[in-house]
């Protein structure tokens, strides 16, 4: 019975991990797009403060999701990905 429960738990963790990785990937893409928008706004001489504030809030949310992803990876005994910017 315990082996079946562990197997089900692992399957559930795998599913959560997959969904979380999709959220993280999408969030990173949106941040890159927003950075492009901010750059274009600067070139046009527009006020970028609201857009930068939005990016800051989005980065905080992304950090939370990355933490969830890392927790799930550790629970599954997997290697953590390199930190952002460590390419």
Which ranges hold each PLM region?
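Anionic, Ser/Thr-rich low-complexity intrinsically disordered regions
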Residues: 1-87
């Amino acid at each position: 019975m315990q082996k079946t429960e562990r197997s089900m738990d692992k399957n559930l963790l795998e599913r959560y991990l997959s969904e979380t990785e999709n959220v993280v990937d999408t969030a990173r893409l949106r941040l890159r797009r927003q950075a492009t928008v901010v750059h274009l706004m600067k070139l046009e001489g527009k006020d970028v403060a609201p857009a930068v504030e939005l990016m800051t809030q989005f980065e905080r949310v992304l950090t939370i999701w990355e933490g969830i992803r890392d927790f799930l990876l550790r629970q599954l005994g997997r290697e953590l990905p390199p930190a952002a910017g460590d390419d």
